[in-house]
Amino acid sequence: MTNGSGASQQRPARGPGNRRSQPQPRDKRHNEKSTHRDQRNDRGPREPSQPRGPRIPDGVDPAELDPSVINELRTLPEDMRDRVGCLLVAAEWALEDDEAESALEFTKEAKRLAGRVASVREAHGITSYRNARYADALSEFRAVRRMTGDDSFIPMVADCERGLGRPERALDVLKGFRPSDPAVKIEAIIVGAGARGDAGQHAAALVMLVFAMATSVLMAQ
């Protein structure tokens, strides 16, 4: 190739001073590869990699889970079943110790591994709720309801709506809710009273709280 004056431009030679050095003799390359292999072998066997996610405390036993949860986890491969079960127990321990953020990390990892298991989504909803992550909790509780048809989470769904600043929507969620479980009924009344108070309906909120207290007393007798 020539420049404007017709002088030739020669391609630079490939040599030690350039990026592409001269090829090494075959024997030398072979010896270097053998040395590298020997060095790798001298390192010994690799240690097994640690599982992703938060470290599970010592002593956690998935057998502590409710039998219904254990039954759900049987749909998973055995190694994953044990890991997810331990994560759920660790989350429960963390909540008992008022370590809500740690509990959330455990259930987040459980959801990553087994997001199609209803009890896992339920656990993640509860830990999200305990961390005031109401939008996330709402999404999880709705997913559980779609998966199982279980309405027992309705009071928590309504309370999430309250947490998001939507008391009227919370009241709509509770409208027509008639749980058979007295404890869930009381929870719904308390959440409804809070929503009434948020909406400025303080007298109605007080009446609902009195009713909840009376119901609680009757249950204790």
List where the protein language model places each region.
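Structural register within alpha-helical repeat arrays
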Residues: 90, 123-124, 157, 192, ...
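Basic Arg/Gly/Lys-rich low-complexity intrinsically disordered segments
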Residues: 1-74, 78, 85
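Alpha-helical segment of the N-proximal tetratricopeptide repeat
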Residues: 75-112, 123
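Structural motif corresponding to the intra-repeat A-B loop/turn of tetratricopeptide repeats
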Residues: 97-98, 131, 164, 199
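Residue-level signature for tetratricopeptide repeat
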Residues: 93, 127, 158-160, 195
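Solenoid-like repeat scaffolds
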Residues: 74-79, 108-115, 142-149, 176-184, ...
